[in-house]
């Protein structure tokens, strides 16, 4: 199944009953693209959707235009929204905890998607994270995992009903001429271009990526690595890039990730953990060779259509990228395999239909 845009919202009264009322709860912007896609599809099927999220997420993703009522994520607003809902759907464990607290005293079913929540830290912080996961897993009527490892984790934490629910990414193809323009803008017309995309946080593995970049300095021509994303590690990464004269540019937050990936010779995903990596999906769809760490849900997602390396091994990462840069035929084979693999993923409509079937099932249980 290839990904396709969900249908635009149209008025409907499903099943001859009053419209189902849902609240989508976000704790940040990480799941916003998925929630906007889900909102569009649910609204098209006659579901009334309220999105409770940070104001900045509404400003960037415009849930209202997708057919939702937007409510800021203040505690009082969340409580009021949840009190009027038939189903509450939280995206992420922290959002799940906030939703569970807001629903205390109510019998409204809670659905929790765990996409984006990785392995817990060690020590006291890890114990606290484990406690949070157990509370949320037990509070949820259904837990949806974007990858099989997340489903397993939810079950270990006590989820009574945990299911695999892959998240489709909205297709955003870039025009061929845009790729050439992007290379020119980045200064990579006559040198290879490597692209990584994601927030500058520890689990993304960018320190390992910079270690690998030291080895690429000796290639002729030396590739340019660009990293699109923002986060707390920016200052430290910038200091390393300057001190070690690494062929790396930090681009900050970008809204044209698809355009950047279409321009790349190789996409790089060095993360410590990923459930259903957005970068991997966009790279394979765009027909760009991908080198990724063999972690989380990545192997399940990409199959044989990417080169996988161990996490935390800069030598293996550097060698894999160098080998692809030296072998255009192998890159072309991966590009073709990537498009074939991407065609097997659920579409946005498939994702909406699966989520709506869960909501309907919960409503039937309550009757």
Regions found by a protein language model. Name each.
Residues 15-76, 150-153:
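N-terminal strand-loop element at the rim of the active site
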Residues 32-41, 192, 196-215, 232-238, ...:
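A conserved mid-protein helix/loop that constitutes part of the nucleotide-sugar donor-binding site
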Residues 90-97, 114:
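Short His-centered aromatic/hydrophobic patch
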Residues 138-163:
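A short, active-site helix/loop in glycosyltransferases that binds the activated sugar's phosphate group
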Residues 238-254:
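Nucleotide-activated donor-binding/catalytic signature segment of Leloir-type glycosyltransferases, i.e.
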Residues 272-275:
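Aromatic "clamp/platform" in nucleotide-sugar-dependent glycosyltransferases that forms part
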Residues 289-292:
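Short hydrophobic beta-strand element within catalytic cores of glycosyltransferases
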Residues 304-315, 323-329:
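Conserved acidic donor-binding segment of nucleotide-sugar-dependent glycosyltransferases
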């Amino acid at each position: 199944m290839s990904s396709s845009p969900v249908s635009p919202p149209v008025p409907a009264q499903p099943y001859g009953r009053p419209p189902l009322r849902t609240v989508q709860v976000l704790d940040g912007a990480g799941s916003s693209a998925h929630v906007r896609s889900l909102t569009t599809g649910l609204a098209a099927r006659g579901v009334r959707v309220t999105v409770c999220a940070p104001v900045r997420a509404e400003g960037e993703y415009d849930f209202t235009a997708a057919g939702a009522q937007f409510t800021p994520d203040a505690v009082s607003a969340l409580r009021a929204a949840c009190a009027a809902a038939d189903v509450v759907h939280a995206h992420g464990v922290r959002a799940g905890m906030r939703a569970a607290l807001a629903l205390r005293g109510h019998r409204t079913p809670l659905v929790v998607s765990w996409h984006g929540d990785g392995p817990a830290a060690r020590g006291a912080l890890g114990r606290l994270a484990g406690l949070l996961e157990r509370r949320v897993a037990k509070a949820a009527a259904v837990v949806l995992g974007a990858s099989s490892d997340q489903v397993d984790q939810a079950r270990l934490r006590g989820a009574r009903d945990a299911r695999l629910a892959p998240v489709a990414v909205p297709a955003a193809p870039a025009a061929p001429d845009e790729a050439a323009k992007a290379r020119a803008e980045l200064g990579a017309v006559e040198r290879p271009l490597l692209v990584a995309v994601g927030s500058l946080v520890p689990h993304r593995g960018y320190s390992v990526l910079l270690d690998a970049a030291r080895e690429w300095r000796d290639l002729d021509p030396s590739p340019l690595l660009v990293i699109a994303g923002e986060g707390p590690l920016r200052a430290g990464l910038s200091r390393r890039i300057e001190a070690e004269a690494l062929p790396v540019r930090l681009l900050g937050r970008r809204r044209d990730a698809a355009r950047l990936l279409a321009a790349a010779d190789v996409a790089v995903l060095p993360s410590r953990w990923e459930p259903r990596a957005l970068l991997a999906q966009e790279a394979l769809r765009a027909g760009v060779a991908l080198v990724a760490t063999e972690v989380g849900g990545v192997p399940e997602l990409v199959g044989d259509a990417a080169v996988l390396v161990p996490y935390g091994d800069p030598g293996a990462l550097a060698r894999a990228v160098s080998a692809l840069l030296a072998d255009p035929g192998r890159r072309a084979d991966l590009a073709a395999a990537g498009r074939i693999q991407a065609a097997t993923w659920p579409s946005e409509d498939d994702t909406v239909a699966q989520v709506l079937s869960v909501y309907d099932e919960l409503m039937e249980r309550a009757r």
